[in-house]
Amino acid sequence: MPSHAKSSLEAGLVALKQGNYQTAIAQLEPIASSQSNATASLQAQVGLVMAYARSGEVPKAIAFSQNLIESNNPQVQEWATRALEHLTKRKKPEQESKKVETGFVAFENSTPDSTPDSTPETPTFEEKPNEQVIETKSDDIPPMVPLAKLKATLATPPPPPTAPLSGFMGSVTRTQAKLFGVIYWRQAQRARAWQPLRKPKLIPLRLLSAGTFIALFWVMREILKLAMGFINQTLVKLPYLEPLQLLYRDPTQVLLIALVILIGVSPWLLDLLLANLYGQREFPKDVLNTHSREAVRVLQRCCQQRHWPLPKLRVLPTAAPIILTYGSLPRNARIVVSQGLLEQLADDEIAIIYATQLGHIAHWDFAVMSLLLLVTLPTHKLYQQVSELGDKISAKIWRWPVTILASLIYGVWCLLTGTALWLSRLRLYYSDRVAAEITGNPNALIRALLKIAIGVAADIQKEEETSWQLESLNLLTPVSYQQSLSLGTIASNLSFESFLKWDTANPYRRWFTINNSHPLMGDRIERLCQIARHWHLDTELHFASVPSKVKRQSFLLQIAPWLGIPLGVLFAALVWITWQLAFALKFLNLKWIYEDWSFITGCLLIGFSIGTVMRINSFFPDIKPATVQTDDSLPNLLSDPSALPIDSISVRLVGKLLGRQGTSNSLAQDLIFQSSAGLVKLHHISWLGQSVNHQDLIGRQIIVTGWFRRGATPWIDIQTLETQSGKTIHSPHPIWSTFLAVAAQAWGAYVFLTG
């Protein structure tokens, strides 16, 4: 686009945002009538619809809407149709004092020569895209990118010149850096009067809360006993030092008493921790009232009904949308919200998110989660500090021990958080239900959850890594940062319904959430839609019934290593029965089996090994150039409801490598691929002896080749990472899988034969 036309377009959009409608009309009309750039013309016409509608010239707004209906782009047609319906029903112009934020949105399938203003026409491989943020206000058109409700869209790099262009205009706040495509919100209504839902059975949640406490206690006890034993063994081997007799004692009783005490004092200790680590501060109710009056009313009404004091309100100065609750009793509960959530959600959405936290308090699961946070937060901080210490050490001979120590601490943190994965998933279903019943607005919760995912992904893209806050507080937040990666960035290329079809239609979907901290987003939203339909409401998302096309054989092959374990038990039983018969017939005396039942362990390892070997070829097929998928195919891969990780789709994608740098990412736990279609998690295994480290490529444009896998969290197993300069990193997933299978086979055979 010529520079003067681009300047006029920008000036017109800025004038529209500021309410200078006549100036906006004067700037946009020449561009709207121009045929030199189709995308800019559509952009200007959308702006003119809003400008004419806001200035009271409804007939002209209708005329431009009718022109837009004839567009070849279906999204433009849908928007223009809704705008025309609104304008034709309108009897008189509304007062200009009533303002609703809207934004221009991305029109998919634009031709390459119709380049968005914010995108250079010939971006290079390493080039960073320009940024443009546009925000307009209008009251006379249907909501596009969230229209007064969504206050944030994602940041993403522009697609390569050969890819379909998307990323037109979006409703954003000044805190957001870039535009990311179309997000269409139906703004489905809330219930004005509703019947109470059937009371859920809380016994599973209660039992799981108790089980989580027991699991946490057991893991901590074993770690403590291991540490105590290691210290004493070290002291024994050192000269002139004696082991500490205290460390030979059983720590069970002391640890149990300590955990009970920690639950009681957790609110005050977490106040100190969050204030010192993340800058948490008090959040006056009056300030919350400026963001969401309904949230204050919900808190006051619910607490009054249950005879609770109002929870203490806190705020975190972070741009990522976060909310969590901690405490030991309803009277000392704290609800912590981030500044980003207050800025990115609408009034009713903030209110229902606060209502979900009241659900955690009502169900008492927040007490166990508070204890978990109190234990894991210092552990995560120690991991962070040791990692930073390792980054300061220049000599490799000293850096390696620190790196190993940081990795061990990270492993301990993962073990501790792993004790609460099941509770973290289940409790969200209960809190969603409570929030919907309190407010009568399940559709607002659907929008809120999706916008939180969008905001979290935007924060990761802006920071180009996963922040410490997102990682350490993940278990207590309503949306996981892992599930936000693809969900929060795919909106311009794929509808939410299409992306979430896997979550609702795949018959084996729940098997892939075992190691996830949060339930499937599509499953949560489908339950909220059921509540909305129960109250005779239209739903924010419409999930069509999709027949299952998943082959059972594919799923069995997917879990072959784990199926090998029960098969190993059957094999052990067969061996034992065979021995009994041989012994009874005085044919053979396998005394080593009779006296030592450890042979069962050997059978389990052998079964696991056989299952792993059976799966390797299907899990890591040869990547052939003729069948490799590129960036354009990523939305289709994400929307396939019948996909399983075993499908192993070969991909070759161009984009940017994101993640933390330094010791804290030595295990490649924070590797994210940013393409024109969104964010995808990467799995990488370091290969000893490589001259190039994966951290050397973070922040650079790369080409990733590997196997795309659709699970609860989509990811890519890396085969190679390449740069424009020719540097290549190999990730030996097949080799390591083979090594694991051989090691398990050898170990199992040794145990089986020797006992």
Feature-to-residue mapping (PLM):
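Hydrophobic or amphipathic, alpha-helical segments that drive membrane association/targeting
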Residues: 2-34, 42, 56-57, 63-113, ...
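Active-site-proximal gating segments in proteases and membrane effectors
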Residues: 310, 315-331, 388, 392-396, ...
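Active-site scaffold of zinc-dependent metalloenzymes
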Residues: 323-345
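An active-site-proximal "capping" alpha-helix that borders the catalytic cofactor pocket
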Residues: 271, 299-303, 424-445
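Post-HExxH zinc-binding segment in Zn-dependent metallohydrolases
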Residues: 375-397
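Active-site recognition of the HExxH zinc-binding catalytic motif
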Residues: 337, 352-360, 364-365, 428-432
